[in-house]
From Swiss-Prot:
Belongs to the universal ribosomal protein uL18 family. This is Large ribosomal subunit protein uL18. Transmembrane segments: none annotated. Pfam families: Ribosomal_L18p (PF00861). Keywords: Ribonucleoprotein, Ribosomal protein, RNA-binding, rRNA-binding. This is one of the proteins that bind and probably mediate the attachment of the 5S RNA into the large ribosomal subunit, where it forms part of the central protuberance. Part of the 50S ribosomal subunit; part of the 5S rRNA/L5/L18/L25 subcomplex. Contacts the 5S and 23S rRNAs. GO terms for biological process: translation. The lineage of its organism: Bacteria, Pseudomonadati, Spirochaetota, Spirochaetia, Spirochaetales. GO terms for cellular component: cytosolic large ribosomal subunit. The keyword GTP-binding does not apply.
């Protein structure tokens, strides 16, 4: 149990270090943050100054019917890019939320860039 608590503390410190480095999202450049569970992949676009979620997308949405794999996460990036373009948002700050930048995280960020969002 002690190892689990120590790992949790390390993860929290890593998240804080990353968040301090990237800064806060503002209205003209909000922060996009990702979360991976064992089954789903969640993404939120957050305006930290106002404390509002501007857009969100996840693999759990019924109309998308996606799984947590690289191809579906790329589709998720395209869907989020379309929603952001509808709201006239073209620049984001990418918050990987303590995860390594590879696999699902990297493919999601790449799909956002390919869709025309400046990350």
């Amino acid at each position: 149990m002690k190892k689990v608590k120590e790992a949790e503390k390390r993860n929290i410190k890593r998240k804080k270090r990353i968040r301090d480095r990237i800064g806060f999202g503002v209205a003209d450049r909000p922060r996009v943050t990702v979360f991976k569970s064992n089954k789903y992949f969640y993404v939120q676009v957050i305006d930290d100054m106002a404390g509002h979620t501007l857009a969100s997308v996840s693999t759990i949405e019924k109309d998308l019917k996606l799984n947590k794999n690289i191809d579906d996460v790329k589709k998720l990036g395209e869907v989020l890019a379309k929603r952001l373009k509808d709201k006239n948002i073209s620049r984001l700050i990418f918050d990987r939320n303590g995860y390594k930048y590879h696999g699902l995280i990297a493919s999601f960020a790449t799909s956002l860039r390919e869709a025309g969002i400046d990350v």
